[in-house]
Swiss-Prot record:
Residues 1-238 are annotated as: Necessary for barbed end capping activity. It comes from Caenorhabditis briggsae. This is Gelsolin-like protein 1. CDD domains: gelsolin_S1_like, gelsolin_S2_like, gelsolin_S3_like, gelsolin_S6_like. Residues 70-73 are annotated as: Actin-actin interfilament contact point. The keyword Zinc does not apply.
Length: 474
């Protein structure tokens, strides 16, 4: 059923550029204040709207792993309302906890934080004056896209390779063991400062435990005493999802919904998909393997068909036994994003001229496990000197080697790029070049892909943990 009116909570949408966030509360939308952007209760569902400029909108509905079926349903309905009020042209995205898209993560520069419970959990906010406060332990994991997930406040939750935040209300401890990464430390400090200064309005004090990581009596009192440090294990390597499914072919499917039960028929396969396969009278699903699932809606489709796009995408996941967290994005005929058009060899947009947006990936080799992470809306500051980065400019691949990358990463940098190119499915020139570039020696051909460039950024350790500590807390 189509909504008969627009929710009053949506009155401000489309009026200015920036981010708006709503949380589902008893079948209604509750605006999330800017000070709480990036905090997500895992028992709830949220809607996030980003306006880059008038006419360019991305609407995401985010699902916590414990969100109820009712909350998920309300989020879907409200997403349709937003779509209607903005003329039916936003790009829609379905986001699942722990598997958010790089675009979604790019909105929250200090990373995101998952909080246990849901709307009815009785979570203590600032106005509770810290009464009956229970300790919260957050595990900060990831390279550029850091996620802070609430875990059990016990010694078994700690490991020596990651950063943890112990939130005691009036006191916040950042635990940074020696094996934790530079970026995780910097992001952990930024997140803790945000909690203290913004969420708590200066009512909390931040304690940084780096040199004192194994002997601070107050911190360890919550984990059985200082002697418990011997029980802490090394970091557990998580299997990386980036390389999965890459042996499969990209496929294009036509959607038929005549009987009310959507069916899909394959109309194209491989790396030579052509734009002419799309028909404005119909809807199509593009399975771009690790690029996600796109539901393309022809301009002659009905409003009802537009509203079903993400449902069709979810049904496709079920029919093809794909993980529930697979990215699903709705795109509209004549308003396609480059993330969609890049998969078609002959797609040329005369308005945009260039139909490919460069992609930046962070590559790290932790304990022999290759980890690849895409960074959306990237800037020069996203180049991390601790790792190897891959900049994909379609017909040119740049391997940027950070000065502090480990020896194996440096040695395997070129092979990593070759592996990336061999397994990638984008239609590109057969003679695509691979160039290796070292930190501090970037040529103009590389710098041009960044919004701005400052040669001084990589000098004098301006982005070291110690320097960031001084900037944040002094």
């Amino acid at each position: 059923m189509r909504p008969t009116s627009i929710d009053p909570a949506l009155a401000e949408i489309g009026k200015k550029n920036g981010l708006l966030v709503w949380r589902i509360n008893k079948f209604e939308l509750e605006p999330v204040p800017e000070t709480e952007h990036g905090i997500f209760f895992i028992g709830d569902a949220y809607i996030v709207l980003n306006q880059k400029y008038e006419g360019c909108w991305d609407v995401h509905f985010w699902l916590g792993k414990n969100a109820s079926t009712d909350e998920i349903g309300v989020a879907a309905i409200k997403t349709v309302e937003i779509d209607d009020s903005l003329g039916g042209i936003p790009t829609q995205h379905r986001e699942v906890q722990n598997y958010e898209s790089p675009l979604f993560l790019s909105y929250f520069t200090d990373g995101i934080r998952y909080v246990a419970g849901g709307y009815e959990s009785g979570y203590n906010h600032v106005e509770d004056q810290f009464k009956n406060w229970k300790p919260h332990l957050f595990h900060c994991k990831g390279k550029r896209n850091v996620r802070c997930t609430e875990v059990e406040c016990e010694v078994g939750s700690l490991n020596l390779g990651d950063v943890f935040i112990l939130d005691l209300g009036k006191d916040i401890y950042i635990w940074m063991p020696p094996d934790s990464g530079r970026l995780e430390r910097v992001k952990g400090m930024a997140r803790a400062k945000n909690i203290a200064d913004v969420e708590r309005m200066g009512a909390s004090k931040v304690h940084i435990l780096d040199d004192e990581w194994d002997n601070d009596p107050t911190f360890w009192s919550y984990f059985g005493g200082v002697s418990s440090v011997k029980k802490v294990t090394k970091s557990k390597d998580d299997d990386d999802n980036y390389w999965k499914r890459l042996s499969e072919q990209i496929t294009l499917w036509k959607v038929s919904d005549v009987t009310g039960a959507a069916k899909v028929t394959m109309v194209g396969q491989g790396e030579n998909l052509k734009k002419e396969l799309l028909d404005s009278k119909d809807a199509f699903i593009l399975d771009a393997i690790n690029g996600g699932i796109f539901v393309w809606i022809g301009r002659e489709c009905t409003l009802e068909e537009r509203s079903k796009a993400l449902i069709w995408g979810q049904n496709y996941l079920k029919q093809h036994h794909l993980p529930k967290w697979t990215q699903v994005t709705r795109v509209l005929d004549t308003a396609e994003s480059t993330q969609f058009t890049q998969w078609f060899r002959d797609w040329v947009d005369e308005k945009k001229k260039n139909t490919f947006q460069p992609l930046l990936f962070q590559v790290s080799d932790e304990s022999g496990l290759l980890h690849v992470e895409e960074i959306a809306n990237f800037t020069q500051e996203d180049l991390d000197g601790d790792d190897v980065m891959i900049l994909d400019a379609l017909n040119s691949i740049y391997v940027w080697v950070g000065s502090n990358a480990n020896p194996n990463e440096k040695k395997e940098a070129l092979n990593t790029a070759k592996s990336y190119l061999e397994k990638d499915k984008l239609p590109r020139h057969k003679k695509t070049s691979i160039d290796t570039i070292y930190q501090g020696q970037e040529p103009p051909t590389f710098k041009k892909f960044f919004p701005s460039w400052d040669d001084a950024l990589f000098k004098n350790q301006v982005r070291s943990v110690e320097n960031m500590r001084r900037l944040l807390f002094h």
